[in-house]
Design a protein with these regions (language model features):
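Extended serine/threonine-enriched, polar tracts that run as long, contiguous segments within proteins
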Residues: 132-210
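OB-fold ssDNA-binding interfaces and closely related basic DNA-contact patches used
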Residues: 1-146, 197-198, 202-204, 210-214, ...
């Protein structure tokens, strides 16, 4: 039997890869990409359940997970680039496919057709419910900054409002006086904290400002992402397990 000998070599030169840059991905559009969600894991998150198909080794309540790479964090540094609030329409568990029935803009009249049920869900006449969802598109800092989305709902809406107030409250001195810089001018630290009310306890977000962006290349990445989101070129693919496991 003929055998083909394979010569062992070291790593290929980056120059070789650069000569073929982007080849093989010419037909990949934004529609074919998954925007990572950053969420806080809770007791009911499938990632912490060792018998679940979505279990992630090392995952535990109170950790942050990147839903695309499954990387786990105790805290993260992010640059917020764009904010968008929406009402996401869901079916109840057991009936849902795991994807939203529809996504309604924040100024939609559909909200006026809902009634609050005993579980504090805003029910539509068709039996589905709406979830007020605050979407924060961010740059996740690290060795290789990446785009991501943090969605806040239920009790985390208060955290989102606080974060928005922090961003709007920043003032800088310019040649024409004080001005409010773009949200992507500053870096924030987000970490999970335990929260509670008369219904129970859960993990939510805590947000703290670190300071201004000092690297122009990072600033340019954040600005470009903000512009793409603003033009509608980046769409979040919400799923029932992409947001925080916040039961209240």
């Amino acid at each position: 039997m003929n055998q083909v000998a394979t010569k062992k070599e070291g790593a290929l030169s980056a120059n070789l890869f650069e000569a073929d840059a982007n080849k093989g991905s010419q037909n990949i559009s934004q529609e074919d990409l998954a925007l990572p969600f950053l969420k806080v894991l809770g007791q009911l998150s499938p990632e912490v359940n060792k018998t679940h198909g979505k279990y992630v080794e090392g995952a535990e309540p109170g950790k942050i997970i990147n839903t695309v790479t499954n990387e786990l964090y105790s805290n993260i540094n992010v640059i917020p680039v764009f904010y968008k609030r929406q009402y996401i329409e869901w079916q109840d568990r057991g009936q849902s496919t795991g994807a939203p029935v529809a996504i309604h803009e924040a100024d939609s009249d559909i909200v006026s057709t809902t009634t609050r049920d005993k579980s504090y869900k805003d029910r539509l006449p068709n039996g589905n419910y709406l979830e007020n969802t605050a979407n924060h598109f961010v740059i996740l800092m690290g060795d290789s900054p990446t785009t991501a989305l943090i969605s806040m709902k239920a009790t985390q809406i208060k955290v989102s409002r606080k974060w928005n107030s922090m961003m709007r409250g920043i003032k800088m001195q310019g040649k024409n006086g004080l001005f409010t810089p773009p949200t992507y001018s500053h870096i924030y630290n987000l970490k999970p904290v335990q929260m509670s009310n008369d219904k129970g306890t859960w993990f939510g977000w805590d947000v703290a400002k670190i300071g201004p962006v000092t690297d122009k290349s990072i600033y340019d990445i954040a600005k470009n992402f903000a512009e793409r989101v603003g033009k509608g070129e980046v769409q979040a693919k919400h799923g029932s397990e992409e947001t925080n496991s916040t039961p209240y």
